[in-house]
């Protein structure tokens, strides 16, 4: 062990400052990078939503699986300090690689704005993510445990508060990064073409990771450093394997039972190691139900964000984007951690209630379950406002009259009259085999035109009409609300030439006469656009402004030449109404989930450290983090296998599962007895001094020093 430094500040070791700043910078780096991944996969690498989501969750799961490797390296080979430094270098390289992979101009040899060697970008991205997963996962179990190592005996209160400060640093880094990196992403940059600036958005987190490494190394002279005690995980595995094999060899009634199944390893392994493994397995047993909490918690970045895309973000004069709602959790954490630590827990203690670690974790699981009940209620309210889209054997159609006369349209069992430059109020729904014929006529004009078109099942269509025998059927291409709360806009031109429209950096090319462009998607707010055409009178403007777009809407803009003066005019028609349920209704579910996180996650970190033997602290921290990985895997399984017709039903399922797990955990915790590993090991040290090292120790089973139920 390194020399213990006497320098301190407010009762805390000064070295803690470097560890907390390191964690803040590292979490900024990780969450800033992670916030961009799905959009990077979809918009830069060109993957579809399903593949992007699968790779994203696989990466997150890998980040929480690699802590096992980090714990093995720290406890068996390099020690915590050298492990953190070594894997932080790997981490920084990974961040730099993914930043380079996002440079469009790296392979854009023809300067068309698209990379010519996409497989190279994919390969670099995967290498970068693999290095990041190894780096961030490898240091996870080491940093918090290394911070706990800096405290002396008798500083239990300061150590417990350190874990709260440590968790506060995590969420402060997360909060700032999720605000800043999306702003960096929307900047335009590039040598040959202006693109979303992923290199800058990834580059800043890479720079912060380098800062984290430098800050951590600067504190080197102040740290208490414990030397690794051999391949502890290997010893544990061998001891457990020997105990199981020895027990089955002696399963006959002729052999007396032993107090604990691990006592069957006493023929080969010393009592100290067996006792330490008993401590570890008791804690690991409590970890079994925990992944269910993380299965719910990590859906903030997926299901809850998708829920926000079906809501409106206008709160007074403030406008919130759907992916910004994730910052609510980080903001609440920064506020609530000190309040809970300095106010709530002391008040509970003054009331005489023994609010132990496992009781706190049980309450946290219950609160997370209730958060999903609230999410289900919000989803029910959202579902009431969502438009109905056609099923697989249905067709939806509306009529848009872009002519100068009223038009009558005859559907099977339904007739509508549409005034000039107007549309039907809603989409009409028909079974595919029901829509056999559509007839169109114009009042005052002889004859009826029959629309000959084969409608595609499961899609919306628009019937454009502008006179007798003049029509066109357009497949809309929108069978759901626009993603991420954006707004879809398409143009229909009645001009007699091919035109181009430029709107907020996007181009609608070659829009032909009396046809519809594809939808392009824009965030909320008013958008400027320019119509390039020769069919415009002198002194007339070709520059226009859209209406003030809300969230999740879609519109058709019809362009025509005004008969009175030859100037262009544009009329807006609503295809999908904007969202009406406000994102503010998500705040209660975020509040409940954050309350659950504060009393569950912070407590879990401290519990894992306090109950671990000195040589197995990183192992138990890795076990704690492994529960997060398994939780992400549960989400993947349920998402793939569930296929719920209603999203609220999936929320209720998750809430019910966690509630059941919460009850099971409470029962398990009731039978757990708290121990002080340091005092137990001190007893072993004292006994070995009396009897001599290597002699048989009288402790045949672990007797707890202090006992507290749950």
Curated annotation (Swiss-Prot):
It comes from the Eukaryota. It is a multi-pass membrane protein. InterPro entries: MFS_trans_sf, Oligopep_transport, POT_fam, PTR2_symporter_CS. It catalyses: a dipeptide(out) + H(+)(out) = a dipeptide(in) + H(+)(in); an L-amino acid tripeptide(out) + H(+)(out) = an L-amino acid tripeptide(in) + H(+)(in); L-alanyl-L-lysine(out) + H(+)(out) = L-alanyl-L-lysine(in) + H(+)(in); L-alanyl-L-proline(out) + H(+)(out) = L-alanyl-L-proline(in) + H(+)(in). The keyword Protease does not apply. One of its GO terms (cellular component) is apical plasma membrane. Keywords: Cell membrane, Glycoprotein, Membrane, Peptide transport, Protein transport, Symport, Transmembrane, Transmembrane helix, Transport. It is found in: Apical cell membrane. Residues 383-586 are annotated as: Extracellular domain (ECD). Residues 698-710 have a biased composition (Polar residues). The extracellular domain (ECD) region specifically binds trypsin. This is Solute carrier family 15 member 1. It comes from Rattus norvegicus (Rat). The gene is Slc15a1.
């Amino acid at each position: 062990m390194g020399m213990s430094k006497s320098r301190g500040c407010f009762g805390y070791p000064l070295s803690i400052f470097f560890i907390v700043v390191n964690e803040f910078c590292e979490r900024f780096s990780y969450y800033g990078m992670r916030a961009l991944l799905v959009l990077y996969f979809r918009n830069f690498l060109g993957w579809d939503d399903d593949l992007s989501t699968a790779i994203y969750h696989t990466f997150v799961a890998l980040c929480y699986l690699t802590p096992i490797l980090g714990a093995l390296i720290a406890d068996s080979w390099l020690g915590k300090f050298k492990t953190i430094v070594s894997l932080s270098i790997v981490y920084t390289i990974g961040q730099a690689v993914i930043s380079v992979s996002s440079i469009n101009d790296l392979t854009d040899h023809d300067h068309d704005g698209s990379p010519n060697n996409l497989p190279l970008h994919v390969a670099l991205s995967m290498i970068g993510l693999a290095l990041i997963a190894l780096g961030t996962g490898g240091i996870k179990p080491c940093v918090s445990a290394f911070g706990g190592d800096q405290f002396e005996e008798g500083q239990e209160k300061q150590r417990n508060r350190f874990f709260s400060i440590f968790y506060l640093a995590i969420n402060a880094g997360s909060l700032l990064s999720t605000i800043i990196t999306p702003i960096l992403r929307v900047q335009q940059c590039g040598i040959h073409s202006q693109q979303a600036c992923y290199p800058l958005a990834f580059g800043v987190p890479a720079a912060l990771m380098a800062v984290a490494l430098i800050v951590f190394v600067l504190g080197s002279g102040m740290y208490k450093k414990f030397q690794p005690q051999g391949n502890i995980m290997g010893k544990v595995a061998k001891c457990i394997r020997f105990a199981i094999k020895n027990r089955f060899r002696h399963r006959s009634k002729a052999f007396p039972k032993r107090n604990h199944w691990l006592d069957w390893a006493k023929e080969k392994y010393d009592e100290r190691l067996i006792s330490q493994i008993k401590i570890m397995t008791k804690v690991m047993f409590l970890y079994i139900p925990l992944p269910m909490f993380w299965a719910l918690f990590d859906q903030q970045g997926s299901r809850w964000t998708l829920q926000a895309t079906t809501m409106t973000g206008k709160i007074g004069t403030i406008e919130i984007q759907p992916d910004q709602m994730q910052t609510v959790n980080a903001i609440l954490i920064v506020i609530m951690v000190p309040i809970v630590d300095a106010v709530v827990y002391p008040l509970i203690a003054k009331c005489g209630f023994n609010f132990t670690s496992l009781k706190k974790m049980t309450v946290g699981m219950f609160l997370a379950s209730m958060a999903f009940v609230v999410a289900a209620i919000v989803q029910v309210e959202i579902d009431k406002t969502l438009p109905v889209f056609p099923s697989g054997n249905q067709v939806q159609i509306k009529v848009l009259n872009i002519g100068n006369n009223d038009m009558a349209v005859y559907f099977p069992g339904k007739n509508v009259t549409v005034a000039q430059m107007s549309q039907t109020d809603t989409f009409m729904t028909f079974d595919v085999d029901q829509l056999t014929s559509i007839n169109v006529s114009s009042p005052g004009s002889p004859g009826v035109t029959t629309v000959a078109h084969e409608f595609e099942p499961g899609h919306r269509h628009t019937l454009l009409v502008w006179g007798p025998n003049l029509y066109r059927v357009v497949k809309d291409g929108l069978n759901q609300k626009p993603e991420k709360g954006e707004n879809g806009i398409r143009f229909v031109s009645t001009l007699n030439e091919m035109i181009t429209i430029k709107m907020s950096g996007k181009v609608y090319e070659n829009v032909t006469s009396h046809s519809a462009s594809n939808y392009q998607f824009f965030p909320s707010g008013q958008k400027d656009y320019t119509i390039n055409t020769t069919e415009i009178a002198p002194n007339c403007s070709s520059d226009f402004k859209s209406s003030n777009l809300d969230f999740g809407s879609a519109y058709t803009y019809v362009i025509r030449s005004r008969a009175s003066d030859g100037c262009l005019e544009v009329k807006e028609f609503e295809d999908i109404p904007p969202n009406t349920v406000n994102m503010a209704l998500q705040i209660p579910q975020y509040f409940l989930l954050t309350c659950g996180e504060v009393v569950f996650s912070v407590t879990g970190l401290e519990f894992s450290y306090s109950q671990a033997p000195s040589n197995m602290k990183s192992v138990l921290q890795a076990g704690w983090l492994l529960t997060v990985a398994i939780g992400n895997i549960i989400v993947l399984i349920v998402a793939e296998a569930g296929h719920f017709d209603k999203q609220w039903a999936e929320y209720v399922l998750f809430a019910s599962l966690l509630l059941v797990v919460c009850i099971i955990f409470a029962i398990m915790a009731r039978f757990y007895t708290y121990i002080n590993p340091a005092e137990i090991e001190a007893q072993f040290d004292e006994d070995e001094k009396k009897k001599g090292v290597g002699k048989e120790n009288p402790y045949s089973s672990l007797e707890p020093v202090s006992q507290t139920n749950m």
